[in-house]
Amino acid sequence: TPLVQMGPNDWLLELFHGPTLAFKDVAMQMLSRLMDHVLRERGERLTIVGATSGDTGGAALEAFKNCNGIDTFFMFSNGKVSDFQRRQMTTIGAENCHAIAIDGSFDDCQSMVKDMFGHQSFANKIRLSAVNSINWGRVMAQVVYYFTAAAALGAPEQRVSFTVPTGNFGDIYAGFVAKQMGLPISRLVIATNENDILARTLTTGDHRLESVKPTITPSMDIQISSNFERLLFEAAGQDSTIVRDLMAALKNNHNYSLPDKMLTFIRDSFDAGVVSEIETLEEVALILRNTGYLTDPHTAIAVKVAREHADPDVPMVTLSTAHPAKFPDTVHDATGKTSHPPVWGDIPAERSETVAHLMNDRACVEAHILEHFFRAQKLINSTAKD
């Protein structure tokens, strides 16, 4: 995770040097090995089911493809991820890895995953587990690069700020955990696109769901950020009753209002900025023109927001969460340049895709998962007899 200097007290933290060219690799590669080791020791199997707005699915399927005791299923919104992101999921070619295209939004996919955990008979039968950022292991691994980046820039004597492209709130929440652990973080800045529920919440205290707007930064096309609930728990003084009531209001009324004390707690650590679609394209071009550096659109949003929240006395680190080659059409539209993936992240054009297209219906998805589960069990039993 190298730091690249863009200007005075202006840094990028490159998190895209893993096998799928996204920051999700940092945690996923560790988590897959830990889970596989424990399951082998116990002689057990698990089924992972997850939802992805783009990068998590590819990173998870890549990380778990050699874990024979773990069957991995990932849902994504059909047509709402880039071609490169889709092919990362659909060309894995491993018997235990499955990509599912859903006719619905990412929030629909994520809600189905949560509901599956509440469907006890299903969850128990397949031994359901998760590796989305609701998995604490993911957050824990991401805390590390906040410490390494800050230490490289002079911490603990020097305070450091971070700006993070934010969708599901897991990456920036890891920064909050680092701050709670004692890392001298001045500000944590949420950078988002026009799906700006987190920025609106920070400004007004009103957390109100709106329709998801499809954009050129699909990893931010989210209205329900799972890890924001973790921050609410801290803001509520770890009172789970308060958080439960807020979540119930969100589910039933599609909004809640934060008490002043909780809002003040959040504002003590966080700022936020919103960047439009046009501004994103302009920023990708501006960064290239000024520095010769090509960014993906999510990183470009964060760079613009970081500039708007810069303090000349405090280093600002912008998290660069994906390689620009993951979004070639957007990068080309903005700059006229073609970004090619490094050799280790390239996907041969002739590699075939395998994907299940399913309705936005939990029962339908569960039936699909069970079909594969029973088929795998039958194969295991047959092998054991031999």
Which ranges hold each PLM region?
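PLP-dependent amino-acid enzyme catalytic core
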Residues: 1-386
